[in-house]
Amino acid sequence: MKLVFGFVCALFYSFMSFGQITQWTDINYANDSLEGHKLDIYLPDGGQTEYKVVVLIYGSAWFANNMKQMAFQAMGKPLLDGGFAVVSINHRSSGDAKFPAQINDVKAAVRFIRAHADEYRLDTSFIGITGFSSGGHLSSLAGTTNGVKVYKVGDTEMDIEGNVGDCTSFS
């Protein structure tokens, strides 16, 4: 009986906690079939016409390409409670593609957000970005390379902006 009561309480709490948010899951931001190119969008229960956005990037030492749900569970709820739309993204792992593919994916997700802002009620005048561990590194890199298309060190050049997805005009 205690087990059933505990289960019912947990079920009730889960509906109470997440029942009011609007969500879209597994949206492919690059118009391909890669797991590493999916994102989830969550809107708080506020009835606003649009919401400022925070992008979440998971940490995985760049080894995983499908942990966006974990990032939302860890950091998304407090952001929703603060009135922000939360976009939790996947990116290609280091096993799937070499650097700078991961930052190209992050920037492609941001371009997708800008291109589809009206559809998902997102206010792109403010797009924050955060993450933990390798996701924190990618969020810092995204912030410090905003507007930088090519990174050059000596004779080596890297395309930091990338051309992932259909929304390249929203860079």
Residue ranges, per PLM feature:
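Bacterial Sec-dependent N-terminal signal peptides
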Residues: M1-T22
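N-terminal cap/lid segment of alpha/beta-hydrolase-fold proteins
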Residues: G19-T49
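Short beta-strand element of the alpha/beta-hydrolase
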Residues: E50-A61
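Serine-hydrolase catalytic-loop signature spanning alpha/beta hydrolases and amidase-signature enzymes
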Residues: A61-N66, V86, F112
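Short amphipathic alpha-helix adjacent to the substrate-entry channel of hydrolases
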Residues: K68-V87
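Alpha/beta-hydrolase active-site loop
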Residues: A97-D118
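Primarily recognizes the serine-hydrolase "nucleophile elbow" in alpha/beta-hydrolase
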Residues: R111-S171
